[in-house]
Regions:
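Conserved hydrophobic/aromatic beta-strand scaffold that supports enzyme active sites
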Residues: 71-73, 205, 230
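Alpha-helical and coiled-coil interaction segments, frequently adjacent to or embedded
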Residues: 269, 274-277
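Acidic low-complexity segments
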Residues: 73, 78-148, 156-163
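Active-site neighborhood of thiol-dependent amide/isopeptide-bond enzymes
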Residues: 9, 130-133, 140-204, 225-227, ...
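Coil-to-beta-strand transition motifs
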Residues: 2, 212-214
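Catalytic Cys-His active-site segments of thiol-dependent hydrolases/isopeptidases
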Residues: 214-234
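Intrinsically disordered, low-complexity N-terminal segments that are enriched in acidic
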Residues: 1-89
Length: 277
């Protein structure tokens, strides 16, 4: 399957402002890129690319005052298969977890696990396998928390969402059960499902470490989906903000597109992510 995706965003800036963008496809999908995948700007600006501590591709730019636009459009090869399901995947004792997963057991800015620990253990500790536990948590979040961009608030934590019963894409509770969980952001189009009439946005989901590997779960949609294109992974949304402006800014435009492509694109010579100039 070939998927075409991209974005076009613009900011109004009252003064020259440093910006970090996290909008490039994650390096783990580099070999799947067929065309494009290079952030462009208007006016043309020098950009510097680097990888952060989580392995995400980031772009630094000093944007001038006024209207500044950024965009990218690319084609990516995908298996066309839904998210993997493995009912037998077990939860690992903490002492058996790989060192690199332990970070994703800890509380973080939006995952205030210490406030949710008692509820999580009282509600989910009697369940059997790791898969059953995680799916039960997703079922709870899906049924008890109302999703909507109108509920977005930049200081709402997992505990706040739990109490208010509204929110956007955030993960919680898995870490309270000693299951490593990391936050992912990326593209997820309406492939294999009825089209959503709402304007398209970037999506978010979680990956949990059970059965010796990372599996994808999505409490918002709560079903295996086709065509996820990960951009970034981290502890929570604070680690994977698509843009961070070090000064006043106003979002002037925001468009995202993701769709299955029938036409085969011209393949890029190396099939890998191009460096940002």
């Amino acid at each position: 399957m070939i998927i075409r995706a991209g974005f076009h965003i613009a900011f109004e800036l009252p003064q020259p402002t440093p910006i970090i963008l996290m909008l490039s496809v994650h390096p783990s999908r580099a070999r799947d890129i067929l065309t494009g995948s290079k952030i462009q700007a208007a006016p043309s600006l020098p950009m510097h690319s680097y990888r952060d501590g989580f392995g995400n591709q980031c772009t630094r730019v000093l944007a001038p005052a006024g209207l500044v636009e950024f965009w990218d459009s690319f084609a990516v090869r995908d298996t066309g298969l839904p998210d993997e399901v493995c009912f037998d995947a077990r939860r690992h004792p903490v002492e058996e977890l790989p060192d690199e997963t332990l970070l994703y057991l800890m509380g973080s800015r939006y995952c205030d696990t210490q406030k949710l620990s008692d509820f999580a253990w009282n509600t989910f500790s009697r369940l059997g396998s790791g898969w059953e536990t995680v799916q039960s948590i997703c079922n709870f979040v899906h049924s008890q928390i109302k999703f909507g961009y109108c509920y977005a608030r930049d200081d709402r934590t997992a505990f706040d969402a739990f109490n208010e019963r509204v929110g956007v894409c955030r993960d919680f509770l898995c870490r309270c059960m000693n299951i490593p969980a990391r936050y992912c952001t990326g593209y997820l189009g309406d492939i294999g499902v009825p089209p959503d009439p709402a304007p398209m946005d970037f999506s978010a989901w979680i990956e949990v470490f059970i059965g010796g590997k990372w599996f994808t779960f999505d409490a918002r949609h709560n079903r295996p989906r086709i065509g996820r294109i990960v951009i970034a992974r981290g502890r929570d949304a604070a680690d994977v903000a698509i843009s961070t402006s070090f000064g006043p800014s106003r979002l002037a435009q925001f468009k995202v597109h993701t769709e299955e492509s029938i036409k085969q694109p011209d393949v890029a010579p190396c099939g890998q992510l191009r460096a940002v100039a």
